[in-house]
Amino acid sequence: MESGTVLLESKSSPLNLLHEMHELRLLGHLCDVTVSIENQGVHEDFMAHKAVLAATSKFFKEVFLNEKSADGTRTNVYLNEVQAVDFASFLEFVYTAKVRVEEDRVQQMLEVAEKLKCLDLSETCLQLKKQMLESVLLELQNFSESQEVEASSGPQVSVTPSSKASVPGEDAHSNGLVDSSDYPIERLGNGLSPETPSKKCKEKLDKKKDVAKPPFPKIRRASGRLAGKKVFVEIPKKKYTRRLREQQKSAEEAAENDKCPQDQSPDNERMETEPAAKSEACPASVELEESLQKVEGEKEEEEGKDGEEKKKSNFQCTVCDKAFLYEKSFLKHIKYHHGVATEVVYRCDTCGQTFANRCNLKSHQRHVHSSERHFPCEMCAKKFKRKKDVKRHVLQVHEGGGERHRCGQCGKGLSSKTALRLHERTHTGDKPYGCTKCDAKFSQPSALKTHLRVHTGERPFVCDECGARFTQNHMLIYHKRCHTGERPFMCETCGKSFASKEYLKHHNRIHTGSKPFKCEVCLRTFAQRNSLYQHIKVHTGERPYCCDQCGKQFTQVNALQRHHRIHTGEKPYMCNACGRTFTDKSTLRRHTSIHDKNTPWKSFLVIVDGSPKNDEGHKTEQPDDEYASPKLSDRLLSFGENSHFNNLLEVQGNVPAVQENSSTGAACKAVVSQDALLTTSISALGELTPQAVSMPAHLPSLTNME
């Protein structure tokens, strides 16, 4: 005999499952996706589970199913149209099926639900907005009734029947409301005496009195949530108000049909149908109607508006002639109603540069073209463009930076105890985090995580402007400043701004004269570590960069780039004082000293776009001034890292000009002595050797540029 089947069903299992998934997310366990929110300069990462997001949001489901990589590694999703606080509430809802938000954020959560295509959250928001609207309608109705009760001097009042119909399924007596069908209704007009109510209406009134109900019950608030505080009403969109009107109209018609029997006199029928007309004149109804029309006018401009309102409508649909005040509403309309997908170009009106989104455009306009500084420091009255610049200024200048957490060995100040503990590992050499694929070890887990991307080739951070990919998020942030032109880090000494804090730190060594990096071979010091690395190649003889046209090798990539300009003839750097062009900045910098010796810091640099220009006919502003040949000076400066060029003495006696192929095509003259010219001619302008330094004492050296 076969046994029957039984159904094993647990009602608590879904709730327990959600609870456990929520706990796993909070602890960061088994999370396989990171959602990065970057909106209005605020960046925040949220860890979650793909399965939960895909099950609750069609947007994430499409993203994850369309992924090319199915290796199970953690992926990153970037959202820039959602605020971090709204997405945090969204995550709490999908993991717990509930979330507590402020009343004025319900509309924001509805928009987030529509963007992420979360039907459950969307339905919840719509239901809540409907309840809020119904409570507001009851509030307005109660207020109008209380005003009528106070103003009425007779024992009978007219009550609009729409109050009961506005909240279907709710008992009006339980809320202390008056049922208009149970009380006689009078209308005074044109000096006529009031009509006598019907007998059946009187009987109903007597029955109500027998229940010990006062003829004018005390009107109280229909919603305990609204009692005792001022209500800020957010009227919903047009489709919800239209639906509410239809429900209200159908309820009024039903109230008119059921109010009195068909055998009543025409006078009573007229008397029973007049409350509908009177309800139109009710102050609450008029006020509600005006508010609804006002909201409809804000959401969707209608054809009957005057000239001023039409001017405010900046965007108009050519298909249905609807006008919109905001570009976002217009683009959403043509996309969902007419199926037109447009590509929006965010372009700066000042410089014409384009951006991927509006946030980058506003950031560019605010920090590049605008010189306004609205945020002053309370201690020194210095002004800044952003609030966080003020905070950083106060911390670094007035509060002594990281003095509160200072390293006992090197004296470096850190911003927190955690940063101090990690910094101390640089002295102890403790590196507890080792790579499983190589022998590399690190003192911080984040450094190990970044290192592993070298083996996997993962570059999860993508620039939406040019498509460049990076292994770390801060590298992407620095890169984006190349597109926006933002330079938020300013030098407190000279006011120069930089795109990254590292560049500012390198720049500050110019003012302090600090050169912490020393070569162990020749004991020469450098301000930057990269400069030391490049210098070490002088001792090792390493020249990894080779010219593909002539085979010459170089120690630095920028030296190879300068060398390439010899073959191409490109001279992209022009002096804005005399128009002369040069192949590199260093030659231009030496040249500009002839224009203004007293201000060596002044920049005459102009970067020339396109192909090299023919600069024939360009001469210096002072034709009597003669300056050294760039080619000769370049060779001299290449010796000994420019260490001897400043020691050259000025001698008397001019010689004929030394011809060279300069950017102007004109002859350049050098102020040298006869013996110096003879010496350079013998060496054929070759590269000087250490023996050349020990030349006879009677041979003077080259002079200054003049």
UniProtKB/Swiss-Prot annotation:
Name the lineage.
Eukaryota, Metazoa, Chordata, Craniata, Vertebrata
Q: Which GO terms describe its cellular component?
A: cytoplasm; nucleolus; nucleoplasm; nucleus
> Which Gene3D superfamilies is this protein grouped with?
Classic Zinc Finger, Potassium Channel Kv1.1, Chain A
SMART domains for the chain = BTB, ZnF_C2H2
The UniProt gene name for this protein comes to: Gzf1
**Would the keyword Repeat turn up in this protein's UniProt record?**
yes
Q: Does the keyword Cytoplasm apply?
A: yes
Physiological role: Transcriptional repressor that binds the GZF1 responsive element (GRE) (consensus: 5'-TGCGCN[TG][CA]TATA-3'). May be regulating VSX2/HOX10 expression.
Keywords, ordered alphabetically = Cytoplasm, DNA-binding, Metal-binding, Nucleus, Phosphoprotein, Repeat, Repressor, Transcription, Transcription regulation, Zinc, Zinc-finger
What positions are modified (Phosphoserine)? 611
GO biological process, alphabetically ordered: branching involved in ureteric bud morphogenesis; negative regulation of DNA-templated transcription; negative regulation of transcription by RNA polymerase II
Task: Cite the BTB domain residue spans from the record.
Answer: 31-103
Which portions of the chain have biased composition (kind: Polar residues)? 149-165
Residue ranges of region Disordered?
149-220, 242-308
State the name under which the record lists this protein.
GDNF-inducible zinc finger protein 1
Per UniProt, the ranges with Basic and acidic residues bias are 197-212, 242-277
Q: Which family does it belong to?
A: Belongs to the krueppel C2H2-type zinc-finger protein family.
Expression by tissue: Expressed in several tissues, with highest levels in liver. Also expressed in embryos from 7 to 17 dpc.
Where do the ZnF regions (C2H2-type) fall? 315-337, 346-369, 375-398, 405-427, 433-455, 461-483, 489-511, 517-539, 545-567, 573-595
Assembly, in brief, is: Interacts with NCL.
Cellular compartment(s)? Nucleus; Cytoplasm; Nucleus, Nucleolus
Among the GO molecular function terms of this UniProt record, one is: DNA-binding transcription repressor activity, RNA polymerase II-specific
